[in-house]
Amino acid sequence: MDRFLVISSDGHAGPHAADYRDYVDPAFRDAFDVALPIQIRMTEEAAKSFLVDDINREWRKGRESQLAGAWDAEARDKVLDADGVAAEVLFPDGVTEMNAPPFGAGFSMPPEGVTADLQWAGCLAHNRWMAEFVATAPERRIGLACIPVLWDIERSLEGIRWAHQNGLRGVIFPPRWGHFAGYHHTRYDPVWEICQDLDLPIHFHSGPAPIEEYFGPMPAPEGHEIQPGAMGIYITEVAQWLVRPLTFMLWGGVFERFPRLKVAITEGTAVWVPEYLALLEQRYSETHYSQKLGDYRSHLSMSPADYFRRNVRVGASCMPRREAQMRHEIGLGTIMWGTDYPHPEGSWPYTREQLLETFQGLPESEIGRMLGGNAAEFYNIDTEKLAPLVARIGPEKRLFVDPARSPA
C-alpha cells in the first residue's frame, strides 16, 4: 500500500456534561443534578489556570462544528478522515470542552473528595456512553473504560467484564492512589489477571497531580494569586506522577506474575523513557552501593527495564521531531503516535503537516511502526478491515521521502 496506516493512541470523547444524566443510574440522578453546576464551576476555574482563555476562544472560532466531534460520531469521522487517521484510542474528555464525566470520574479518578458509590456511578455512566459511541464505528474506535480500581476489587472485576462484553478494548486506572495501597500490592493481582486474560491494556493518562500544591486551592478564593512558576512546576512534575504507577508495577513483580499484561502511558511525552530505563537498569544491577539494601531483586527474573520493553507502550501525543530522532533510544517498538484531538495542544487541525514535520526523511518502515503498526499490534486491530479506509485517507508515503532531511 502506498499510504500509511495511522492509529492515534490519544483521542478524547464524551457528551455534554448535562447529557451524562441519562447514563447515570437513576438512584444517583438527584445527586447528579446537585453536582452538575458545581462541576461546571470548578471546570471553569480549572480552565482559567490551565488555559489562556483569550487564546482558547480565538482557537475555537470557526471550528465549533469540527470540535463537536468530541460527542458527535459523524463530525468526528470527518475530522479523522481529514487528518488521515484510520483508528484511535478514546479517553474521556475534560476541561477543553467542559464535558468531563461526573463525580470525579474520567482518567483522573482521584481517591479524595468523592465517595466510592458516586465515583463508580460517574465511571459507569461514561462507560455506557462510550460503548454506544464505539458501536457507531467499532473498527476505528478503541474505547476505554474508566475503572476506579482503588475502592473495591470485586466491583472492579465486574466493571472490567462489562467493558469487555460491551465492546470496550482497554481500561483506565487512576495514576494516584492517595491512602490506598500502591500498585505493587498483591491485592490488585485479580485485576492484573483479568486484564491479561481478556487482553485489555491498562492505561494511565497524563494530567493528575497534586494541583493544589502548584496553584493553590480550587475553586480559588477571591483575591487568590497563583505563585510564580506554578505552571512550569506542574508541567515538569506531571510526567513523574504519570510514570509512578509503572515504577510500582515494575518493581512489584506484576509483569513477572502476569507476563502478557499490557500497559500504556499516554500524553506524558516520550523523552523521559531512555533515562528512566537507564535508571531502572542501574538500580537493578548488583553494585557495591546496593549491597546494604538487601535482596530486592530475587522475585524478578529480569530487570525492570526489560519488563518495560516487553509489556509497556508509550502514547506519544503531538510527538515532536526531537522524539522521532530519539526513537531507537526510546524504543522503536514502544512509540505509539497520537493526535490528542480535540484538545488545542494537539496536532489537529494541522495533523498532516505535523506528521511531515516530525517524520519526513525517516525510514518508511520505522514511520509505519510509530504511526500505526505498534498500536495495531498492541490492540490486536484487524488492519484488513481498515485497509479500504487507509487507501482513501491515509497519508501518502511518497510525501515523507526527503533526502535532504537526516534519518538520524
Locate the predicted segments by residue.
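Short catalytic/ligand-binding loop motif for oxyanion handling, primarily in non-cytosolic enzymes
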Residues: G14-A17, E88-L90, T96-P102, W151-R155, ...
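Short, well-ordered beta-to-alpha junction loops that form the rim of enzyme active sites
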Residues: G11, V85, L90-G94, C146-P148, ...
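Divalent metal-dependent hydrolysis catalytic cores, especially in the metallo-beta-lactamase
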Residues: V6, R60-E64, D81-G104, R140-V149, ...
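Mid-to-C-terminal alpha-helical segments outside catalytic/metal-binding sites
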Residues: D2-I7, H16-A87, A121, R128-T136, ...
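Catalytic pocket-lining loop regions of alpha/beta-barrel enzymes
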Residues: L118-Q119, V134, R140-I142, E158-M336, ...
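Short glycine/proline- and charge-enriched loop/turn segments
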Residues: A105-G113, P221-Y234, T351-L356
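Surface-exposed, active-site-proximal loop segments in enzymatic domains
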Residues: N56-K61, N99-T115, E154
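Short, flexible, mixed-charge acidic loops at enzyme active sites
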Residues: V95-G106, F215-E225
